[in-house]
Amino acid sequence: MRMDKSCCWEGDFSALLRGKVAFLVGRVCLVSVNTASCPVCGCPMIRHGRTSSGRQRWRCKPCKITTLNEIDSTAKHLDEFLAWLLSRRRQADLPGGGRSFRRRCEPLWQLWPFSPIVDEVHDVIFVDGIHLGRGAVVLIAQTPDCVLGWYAARSENSRAWEALMSRIAPPALVVTDGGSGFAKACKRIWPTTRIQRCTFHAYCRIRQAATTRPKLAASQGLYALGQQLLHVEDREEAQEWIGAYQDWCTRWKDFLEEKTRRPDGGWEYTHERLVRARNSLNKLIRQGLLFTYLDPTWDQPMPATTNQIESTNARLRQMLRDHRGMRLTRRMKAVFWWCYTHSAHPQPAARILATMPTDADLENAWYNASQTHQATAIIPGWGDAICWNELHHTTPYHNTWD
């Protein structure tokens, strides 16, 4: 017979008989490869019957405890879950119509893959937000190579941007589409970082005001300037564009100042959309955010648009369409998982399960924080409570008057 066991012994190894039988002098301890180890002392365990369901029971002789040798397949299920989420496969096409897959992956939806802290300084970072509905948006920051961070919020505001940017080292340049609250957050968190407003979004603002088939001469001139804005490649062309834009503002100044009376008696600009586009461009030129990428101090070509992160948003929307029907929290977690798998150093599944928090962990954290806040509010401090001695006397009160 063939021995498929690893042997450890105390004593002298005597001889091998024809390569089949081992004679051991002294005490012999044969440990099978499939033997379970004791969770307390680490010694090998022996088989000790089976449970009512037919599973093998194991017993440790020194500790005299019994246990079941369970195999944790959660990491394998997480890899399967991520492979499905990042693909275009439908659950209906999986074996069994996806019922077994949903049962295996149900606990994995409890995980929250949070973004890591990025201490590496990058030359350029793109920021944008993908809206998942009227009450949720995921803010994303990335480089041309990988995703750096993500943050879920109710809307794009300065507090949400600060929460995202505080975990990332300030870059040399950040390219944005001009989202609400970003400028304020950047001034506080990344004060030394220069901002480049996406020129394509500036063009879209012009196109929205003038339309693609303008009828008015002022709209035609502004739309032509918007098309030229996308092809500015050096400082000389930028100065020429700014000069042409200023000429347009001077020529149509009186036209843009025309006002019309509303039915309620108030006044409004007759060409309000053109006025808004003009004010937006004036602000970008005045703050120097339109042609930051053409600064001669850069030692490498800098991007003028957010095309890189817009491509990421397109892939995220495609993923949500492929797996449409998920509720809001799962759509949010799906975006989180995509960003995490496309980050610089994603961890293996086993490490993710050991480090990433779950819904229960977040609920406990919020509960503990609320309890601490209540205790702090209940316990009085100096100057926020009435002292007993201020309203009472320690000596007895004598009512001796008539």
Language-model segment annotations:
Residues 1-36:
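A broadly conserved sequence feature marking short terminus-proximal activation segments
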Residues 30-33, 55, 59, 65-69, ...:
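RNase H-like nuclease fold core
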Residues 38-41, 60:
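Short cysteine-rich clusters marking metal-coordination/redox-active sites
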Residues 43-46, 68:
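Short functional micro-motifs and their immediate structural scaffolds
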Residues 47-57:
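Short linker/helix segments within small regulatory modules
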Residues 57, 62-64, 68-75, 80-81, ...:
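Acidic/histidine-rich catalytic cores and adjacent linkers
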Residues 85-95:
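Short, charged amphipathic recognition helices of the HTH superfamily
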Residues 177-226:
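Conserved beta-strand -> loop -> alpha-helix junction used to position metal-binding or nucleic-acid-contacting
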